[in-house]
Amino acid sequence: MHFTHDMKYLFIAEKPSLMRDVQACYRNHKQEVTERVGEIDFTALSGHVCTNCMPTDYEEWKDKSWKAIVYPMIPNPWQIKPIADRRKQETLAQIKRRAADYDGIIVGTDSDVEGYGIYWLMEQYLGLNEKPALRFIEHSLTDAEI
């Protein structure tokens, strides 16, 4: 996919503090950023919002005792579920509703394995994997670095 300045992105931050810092920088440099990347809107997670399903979440293992299960347990396909927290589920619902209005996503989770996992689980659960995604990698949260 070719990225152009007329595209519209949803920046999904891992935490509200990161969203506020990046959003403030964006406001200070909006014309320059818009000319290079496009328009950006912001939202924030509060860390993990999805998780892999537990064995008891799968129909084939739901009512079986651990002794009755054949190992290894390899679900096919793997399933993902939202974390059982009302605010996190509301955040997921909001992102799902809003995502259709954007050409792509800017992933603002921490640039480590855990941060990637937070986004990947959410992306798979919400079906965002067809949207182009750009990765925001933070080194520090100063205006110059952002």
Question: Model-derived features: where do they sit?
Answer:
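Intrinsically disordered, low-complexity regulatory segments
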Residues: 1-146
